[in-house]
Amino acid sequence: MQVLVNKIWYEGHPLRWLLLPFSVLFALITAIRRSLFRLGLKSQTPLPVPVIVVGNITVGGSGKTPTVIYLIELLRQQGFNPGVISRGYGADMQGVKVVTAADSAASVGDEPAMIVARTGVPMVVGAKRVDTAKALLAQFAVDVIICDDGLQHYALGRDIELVVIDGKRGLGNRHLLPAGPLREGAWRLNQVDFVVVNGGPAQANQYEMQLSPSAVLPVNPKAVAVFDPTQPVVAMAGIGHPARFFETLTQQGFQLALSHGFDDHQAYDKEVLCELAASRPLMMTEKDAVKCRDFAQENWWYLAVDAKLSPQFDQQLLSRVRSVAAAKQGKSHGV
């Protein structure tokens, strides 16, 4: 199914024309929804600290999670104490939940499990972003909130909007769902504060981001094996665009005996992965690793990557955060 969807959205498959009437309906529904917020018929909840929403206007992975991790580290380096909220897509939960390093991806979602495992940041997940933000502020002394995804969740007040675009696939055929991958039209890029292009050339007023491989690490934290870079690996990825990961491995000099893409957010079965790997090392993404760590074998590995952005981006982002923080502190003191 995903193969057909990708052909429709990114390869010009003619079936897209049959889906266009549904895209028109989707456009109408989303336009009405935005109008309700703009006219004040639906309310947006402001928060007492700066809120950065990291999202995209397309369906599927674009590099939001590495961007969130980058922002966490950048803000911490400048003395801020950020916290993160997320939907926790696919999580088996009700209400809101504080994410801990002991939580499984099944209980809190793939991305939250990965973010907390990497950074230890205060994080709360839940279906309603406003409720998760309030819970985060109630339980942790955070002074900046980063919302992982949620660009279209207009009930959450936000001060900075950052959109991540896949530099390889772009906006696909530029049609709205379901004929294309767009959640909102390309016009939305002109309204956000920052547009970050992951792995591709940035246009004027956009910022280029590269994902730089940093280390090969064991999926099983108790494993004592040492990775042999001369040995061919079986590569797997359950992300929005698996081919990007396989291309990265090849560029880094890995020999791929086999590559296999899974659906994004897919749960994994130990037996299936053992059969896939056979006797060879299994190489996966960091997001996949958090779903496999409880049953990982000695020769299962993941490639950690770090987002790299320009000093100009850092300067502009931090300047905006400080400005918003000062304004909100002034309001709280009646200035």
From Swiss-Prot:
It comes from the Bacteria. The keyword Protein biosynthesis does not apply. Pathway: Glycolipid biosynthesis; lipid IV(A) biosynthesis; lipid IV(A) from (3R)-3-hydroxytetradecanoyl-[acyl-carrier-protein] and UDP-N-acetyl-alpha-D-glucosamine: step 6/6. Its EC number is 2.7.1.130. ATP binds at residues 58-65. One of its GO terms (biological process) is lipopolysaccharide core region biosynthetic process. GO terms for molecular function: ATP binding; tetraacyldisaccharide 4'-kinase activity. Keywords: ATP-binding, Kinase, Lipid A biosynthesis, Lipid biosynthesis, Lipid metabolism, Nucleotide-binding, Transferase. It catalyses: a lipid A disaccharide + ATP = a lipid IVA + ADP + H(+). GO terms for cellular component: plasma membrane. It is an enzyme of class 2 (transferase). The keyword Ribonucleoprotein does not apply. Belongs to the LpxK family. PANTHER family: TETRAACYLDISACCHARIDE 4'-KINASE, TETRAACYLDISACCHARIDE 4'-KINASE, MITOCHONDRIAL-RELATED. Transfers the gamma-phosphate of ATP to the 4'-position of a tetraacyldisaccharide 1-phosphate intermediate (termed DS-1-P) to form tetraacyldisaccharide 1,4'-bis-phosphate (lipid IVA). This is Tetraacyldisaccharide 4'-kinase. It comes from Shewanella sp. (strain MR-4).
